[in-house]
């Protein structure tokens, strides 16, 4: 097992230099010039880590890109494999993306829907939000799901034991401003254009069923719920589930990579010990937010676990670019926190 830690000095001024190139004829590794942001928001979304993931994996792209924990879909929407099997146990995410794929939902339907209900929300405040939430739990309408996803507290996506959405209202004035609606519509339109050019299947299925479809030329990317942290997983996720997953992925006939948190300032994820002797691990430091205040920013070390033979060794000298992108994506960081985070240079060690 090789554990690689990505830390570099903070540049004085952030200037992104994007190549947008793949290496040879392979799909991965590559660097993505413009990150596609999905219309669905999830906690733990990998927007800031997309280029880190895409540039760390080596895969020819001859088979299917398989994701058993799709979540927002941000990784798949940026990897852009010609063929993909994208699954989640959350039927509402899958239903929304299927309807966008079939063009039953497009930017115009989203614009009209959000403008109408956004105006009523502004007048009715929390009461109207809870009316919409109750209506969604009865009808499962994908547009209502999108509305709740953008109007709920802190972008949470949480369901009770009966499968009902139960996140409270986000008391933010002018929640569905003209600019915000345009942003969501653009995200829907971008995704729809992608789906017109690829052969992707969206399914509601447990992860066991999904990875069982993998063949030799495929690649499985896994972003399971983080043990010990709140997650958006539609069903429960236990330590026993995680152990079962670690056993089964080591039996896959194809390449795989798994995202996981390694440690934060409070503790270390001991579950990662299941991969230390069999896989290569690349780590990446970044901040996550649990609120608008600077005091609520926390650093976390993310790990990308990769099957031997499927990692891009040349990527290890290019980590500076990904860190520059993260700084550009998050202008709320203060300079002291940045300098503390990037005080060390890239280094390797063997276990």
Regions found by a protein language model. Name each.
Residues 16-59, 104-221, 225-230, 345:
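SAM-dependent nucleic-acid methyltransferase catalytic core
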Residues 59-62, 79-84, 214-218, 250-255, ...:
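Short glycine/proline-enriched coil/turn segments at helix->beta-strand junctions
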Residues 63-127:
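SAM cofactor-binding core of SAM-dependent methyltransferases
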Residues 72-75, 90-93, 151-154, 207-210, ...:
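Short, solvent-exposed loop/turn segments at secondary-structure junctions
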Residues 238-350:
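Long, positively charged, glycine-interspersed low-complexity recognition regions
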Residues 82, 194-200, 277-279:
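A short helix-to-beta-strand connector/capping loop
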Residues 171, 209-211, 224-246, 264-268:
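Residues lining hydrophobic/aromatic ligand-binding pockets adjacent to catalytic sites
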Residues 2-5, 10, 15-17:
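Intrinsically disordered, low-complexity proline-rich tandem-repeat tracts
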């Amino acid at each position: 097992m090789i554990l690689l830690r990505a830390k570099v000095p903070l540049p004085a001024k952030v200037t992104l230099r994007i190549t947008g190139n793949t290496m040879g004829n392979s799909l991965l590794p590559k660097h993505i010039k413009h990150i596609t942001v999905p219309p669905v928001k999830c906690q733990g979304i990998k927007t800031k880590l997309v280029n880190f993931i895409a540039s760390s994996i080596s895969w020819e792209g001859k088979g299917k890109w398989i994701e058993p924990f799709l979540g927002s879909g941000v990784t798949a929407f940026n990897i852009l494999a010609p063929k993909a099997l994208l699954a989640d146990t959350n039927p509402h995410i899958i239903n929304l993306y299927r309807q966008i794929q079939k063009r039953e939902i497009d930017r115009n339907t989203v614009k009209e829907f959000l403008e109408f209900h956004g105006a009523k929300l502004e007048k009715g405040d929390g009461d109207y939000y809870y009316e919409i939430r109750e209506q969604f739990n009865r009808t499962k309408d994908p547009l209502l799901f999108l509305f709740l996803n953008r109007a709920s507290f802190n972008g949470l996506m949480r369901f009770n034991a009966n499968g009902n959405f139960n996140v409270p209202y986000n008391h933010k004035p002018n929640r569905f401003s003209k600019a915000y609606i345009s942003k969501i519509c653009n995200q829907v339109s971008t995704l729809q254009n992608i789906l017109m050019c690829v052969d992707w299947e969206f399914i509601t299925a447990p992860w066991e069923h999904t990875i069982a479809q993998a063949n030799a030329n495929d690649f499985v990317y896994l972003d399971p719920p983080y043990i010990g942290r709140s997650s958006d997983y539609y069903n429960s996720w236990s330590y026993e589930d995680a152990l079962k997953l670690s056993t089964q992925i080591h039996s896959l006939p194809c390449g795989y990579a798994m995202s996981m948190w390694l440690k934060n300032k409070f503790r270390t994820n001991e579950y990662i010990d299941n991969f230390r002797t069999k896989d290569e691990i690349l780590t990446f430091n970044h901040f996550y937010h649990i609120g608008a205040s600077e005091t609520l920013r926390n650093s976390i070390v993310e790990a990308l676990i990769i099957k031997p033979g499927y990692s891009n060794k040349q990527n290890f000298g290019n980590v500076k670019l990904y860190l520059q992108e993260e700084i550009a994506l998050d202008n709320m960081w203060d300079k002291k926190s940045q300098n503390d985070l990037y005080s060390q240079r890239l280094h390797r060690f063997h276990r």
